[in-house]
A protein has these predicted regions:
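Short amphipathic alpha-helices and their capping/turn segments at secondary-structure boundaries
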Residues: 1-3, 61-62
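Generic marker of "main functional regions" within proteins
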Residues: 18-24, 60, 85, 89, ...
Length: 141
């Protein structure tokens, strides 16, 4: 089975930047590309009632184990990314964070002031953008 990290690295490469001027939902048809990929994965995982609605929302049901009376749990996330920076041709990088400034490229860096809590991840492997695009991590995780 594919690891969560491998899936995530694949998900962030989908071009899902929103377009605030279309007046549609989703704001771009390409956002449904990720939705269709997620549907295939949910079906492969044997979830039931897998479908995408007209707004691009992907829904599926994971029933309780046989003989178990348990409530249904919903997992909800949006798939679009902000238009603040490009979301096309995302090139995620794996880096070991050693503390302090984390240079993404010659002109873009992450700092603990910009990213509160970054200091809690010293010594850990982080998935970051190359600084030319948004990663879309909050959307596609």
């Amino acid at each position: 089975m594919e690891s969560a990290k491998s899936r995530f690295l694949r998900y962030v490469t989908y071009y899902t930047t929103s377009d605030e001027f279309t007046g549609t939902s989703p704001s771009t048809e390409r956002q449904k590309d990720l939705g269709r990929a997620l549907m295939q994965e949910l079906e492969a995982l044997k979830l039931e009632d897998v479908h995408m609605d007209d707004c691009g929302n992907v829904l599926a049901t994971l029933p309780a184990s046989e003989g178990v009376d348990a409530p249904v749990i919903a997992l909800i996330a949006h798939m679009d990314t902000a238009p603040d920076a490009s979301g096309e041709n995302v090139k995620p990088r794996l880096v070991r964070y050693e503390g302090g400034e984390l240079k993404l490229n010659d002109t873009v860096s992450l700092t603990e002031a910009l990213c509160p809590g970054l200091e809690n991840h010293v010594g850990e492997e982080l998935i970051v953008t190359d600084g030319t695009t948004l990663l879309g991590a909050d959307d596609k995780a």
